A protein has these predicted regions:
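Mid/C-terminal beta-alpha module of Rossmann-like enzyme folds, strongest
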Residues: 92-146, 186-189
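C-terminal amphipathic/interface module of NAD(P)-dependent oxidoreductases
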Residues: 147-190
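Short, amphipathic alpha-helical "lid/cap" segments that border enzyme active or binding sites
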Residues: 88-96, 175-179
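Catalytic helix-loop patch of NAD(P)-dependent Rossmann-fold dehydrogenases
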Residues: 3, 7-47
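A conserved pocket-lining segment of Rossmann-fold NAD(P)-dependent short-chain dehydrogenase/reductase
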Residues: 18, 63-86
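Active-site segment of SDR-like NAD(P)-dependent oxidoreductases
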Residues: 1-4, 51-54
Length: 190
């Protein structure tokens, strides 16, 4: 997820959308200003705004798989809200590509953001279990600025081509890799 963007509902987000960081990540704005000042002084300041990472060894994927197998998913926010992510492989590719890019700010995410419900249901389907229950959307507000930040709908656009257009395509690859490593047996991959 792109934690500093505001909740934009169904609207597309690009790098020109003003940031609204929460208390815990407001230093992102300072970091981006530093990159801009570096560029103004003749350097090549590059900012990559990553989505939520996923990969075979990602702790959040391991935890989410365990939760979904247990019938629930601790992802706050409205089920229809968008969720932007990026595979570890595509994130690495974006970093390498940035070495050749001009100064600027770039979203580094999958080409197609998924709605939270679609993200969770398709992962449950790949695991061969029923769709998980999720906490009601309003519960995120009980966790203050962090909860509200995590519940935002962020349908972000991406300028680079990804190996996996969305988590829907990337997930089977990471689940197969997990299975090959014997990290977590999988019932079915679709």
């Amino acid at each position: 997820m792109l934690p500093a963007y505001p909740d934009c509902g169904d609207r597309w987000i690009d790098e020109t959308v003003a940031l609204e960081p929460a208390r815990y990540n407001r230093t992102l704005v300072d970091a981006e200003r530093s990159a801009q000042r570096f560029t103004e002084r003749g350097g090549t300041g590059i900012v990559l705004r990553f989505g939520a990472f996923y990969g075979p060894d990602a702790n959040q994927i391991t935890n989410l798989i365990q939760s979904i197998r247990g019938g629930w998913a601790p992802i706050p926010g409205r089920p229809e809200a968008f969720f932007s992510s990026i595979s570890h492989d595509d994130a690495a590719t974006a970093v390498v590509a940035a070495l050749q890019a001009g100064a600027g700010t770039y979203n580094a995410i999958d080409d197609e953001p998924l709605r939270r419900r679609e993200y969770l249901d398709s992962l449950a389907q790949a695991l061969g279990v029923p769709p998980p229950k999720t906490p009601p959307g309003w519960i995120a507000h009980l966790f203050g600025s962090l909860g509200r930040l995590l519940a935002r709908s962020q349908r972000a656009s991406n300028v680079c081509a990804s190996k996996y257009p969305s988590n829907r395509e990337g997930r089977p690859a990471i689940l197969l890799e997990r299975q090959a490593r014997n990290a977590a047996p999988i019932a079915r991959i679709s």
